Structures are given as structure tokens and as C-alpha cells.
Amino acid sequence: MILEIPKNAETILHILEKAGYEAYVVGGCVRDSILGRSPDAWDLTTSAKPEQVKALFHRTVDTGLQHGTVTVLMEKEGYEVTTYRVDGEYEAGRHPKEVTFTASLKEDLKRRDFTINAMAYNPSSGLVDLFGGLEDIERKIIRCVGDPLERFTEDALRIMRAVRFSAQLGFTIEEETRKALKVLAPNLQHVSAERIQVELVKLLMSPHPDYLRVAYEAGITAEFLPEFDACMTTSQNTPHHCYTVGEHILHSLCHVRADKVLRITMLLHDIGKPVVRKTDENGRDHFKMHGIAGEKMAAQILRRLKFDNDTIRKVTRLVKWHDDRPEGMTKAVRRAVNRIGEDLFPYYLEVQQADMLAQSDYRRTEKQERLDKVKEAYETIINEHQCVSLKTLAVTGKDLIEAGYKPGREIGETLNRLLEVVLADPQKNQKEILLGLLDEK
């Protein structure tokens, strides 16, 4: 098998080999090349020790000497070159306390997580595949190298990585590996929220975000997102739905594009339903105010998982308003844009579309027609530059002060009153007209 590798990476391999060392590109870049994907980075492994690597190249950065890693700079790119190593005992299910350098490529590959990530390649030796990674790629399987219980015990984050790779590649997790996931899922409590967040986002941004179901079935989500588990067991006995809340969420994820805010919003949009669910005397379920409850829960979840404030702001606002259904009249849509926010309204439209597509077919045509009218009205508002917030109101606080108003709460209240006038009739968004309205009072 011949793989195409970047010229700079090939140069590094050649220099190391010419100096008498073994050297290979390794891991994810080999996997992605075999799959016909463009690797994000090209990592190299070598029998040379870090100081020997540094002696061979003019420009290097000490990125992880304790783990045997030196970054070699070639032109404007950096390539991580790591010495063959054997990992010692892992600390708190995260990182090895110490590593031991080895002269054996096999020993180095043996410590890696999955067979598809445990292959090495160089142009002269070809593909080195000691654990069946190529066959597992062909069979579309995620399998641990060696004993999966050992691999997951070494670093519990590999539990999340197994599901994430499955979702990214559309692969099935091999049976013994899957069993080990279930046994060791509780070890995720030893993994930092930041590391879990990174893997969750990668899973959600993958071509198969609904593979979160695999994480649920293995008991993984119970460790960091128990609110989702509650959704999976919450039925929706209503004509509008044909799935449990959780299954509806999983289906909705597949109906939005791979945007971080959108995917996280779909994950959390109905997270409040289990806590507000009421069943009437006819056995029909109701979920009144689930957007409000969901907004609060989403904020708690996102903070717990250490998301940034901008993501929290956007997602919680979309969760709050996701079920808001203005009629298609332009006036109602102007008010909705004002409520939800100019920056978030396009997202809101995508959220509503995905939410609807993950429901039953009940009144689907009617729902789609209403949403299409809202989209049309929104286009009109944008194209005509209609005022939907204080930002584009023709009168400012400064204008009111000049008109004799005192700085303070009265100015804010007056501006909001004028905005209400303009939301009802955008033609009145003219300074003279608005100030004239004040004179009438």
C-alpha cells in the first residue's frame, strides 16, 4: 500500500533514517489517509531520542519532552516527532505517570487506543499494521488494541473517544470493546469536564450525531449528562410526536447542519420536558413552559461542562424560544426577531425546522406552511432594513436628553415604548415622527 504524505513529513523521515534511526508517520494521519480523508496533522514516531531529534534539525520546539515529543518546524508547519515509548502506570485514569523509551515500534503501537489508530507508515517500509487496523477499517469496526478493559482503565477518556470515532467514521464498536465501555463508563467521573466537552462536541459535529444513542446504551451519558438519560425514558403521548423525548432529540440532531451552536441547541432543546411533563385525564402528555425550564437546565449543563459564555448565551436563548411560534405576519415576526435576537433568529429558524422534521407527520403540511411564511416575512424585514431593536431605532438616548429627559430609567422606558410603536409600524421609524409622538403625551 502506498500512501501520499506531505513533502515536509517525508523530508523529516528521510533525515532520521539517513542518521540511522527508524521513523514513521503514525496514528490518525495513517488512518485518515487510508480512508481517503485529509489528515488534520501528520505525527511521526521514531527510535531516535528527543535530544537526537533536536540535534538533527535546526528549528525545534520542546512541546513534550517528558513524553518524548519534539516539534520539528519545516517552513511554516510543525510536525510532532515522538520517540517510541512504553507508558507506565496511568495517573487518575488520564496520563501515564512516566514513560519509558523503547527501541521497538511494536511496543509503541501496542500502547495506543484503537487498532485503526495503531498503524505506522513510511515510503520505504510501507504500512506497519500489527493489530489488524486495516482489516477493521475495511470492516468499519472500532476495536481496542489488546484488552479493552486495560485500554479504558489507562485513560477513561478513551471511552468517549470510542463513541466519537464511531460517529465520525460511521463505524460499529466491536462487541468486546462495547462490553468494556459499559463496565468502565463510571470511570469518566475521573475525567475533567473540559476533556469530556471536547469529545462531546466532536461527536455532535460528526456526520452521525445520533450515535449519542450508543453512549446512552453503554451508560456513558449517565456519567456526564443524566438529564439526557431522563429524556430517553420520557414518553410523548401526543399526536405531534412519535418518539420518546430522547429519540426525538437524536433525530432532530440529524436535521441541522454541523454547526456547534445548532447541534448543542438540538441536544438540549427539549431537555426540560421530563421535569414539566403532565398527563391529562385522557392520557395525553403536555409539556407547558418546557422552553423556560430547559433554558435554566441548559445553562446548568453547559456551565458544568465548562462551555464558553458566548456558546452558553446563544444556546440557552435558543432553547428558551425554540417553541415560540409567531404567525407569518410581518408584524408578529418583527416582534419575534426582537424577542429572540437579531443574531440568533436565523438559527432559530433552523432549530424550528429540525424540531418539526423530528416530530410525527401530524399537521406537518400546516406546520411547514406557517414556518415558510415566517421565513418569508423575515426576508422582507431584512431586505427592507426594518427596525427590530433599539440598535436601529431612529431616536437615541442622546436625542431624549436633548429633548429634556433626565438620564436614568425613564430614558430606557421611553425608548422601549417608541420601539413598540416601530415594531407595529416600521414606517414610523423616523426621528421627527417619534419625537412628535412624545410631544403628544
Where are the predicted features?
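Catalytic cores of the polymerase beta-like nucleotidyltransferase superfamily
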Residues: 1-441
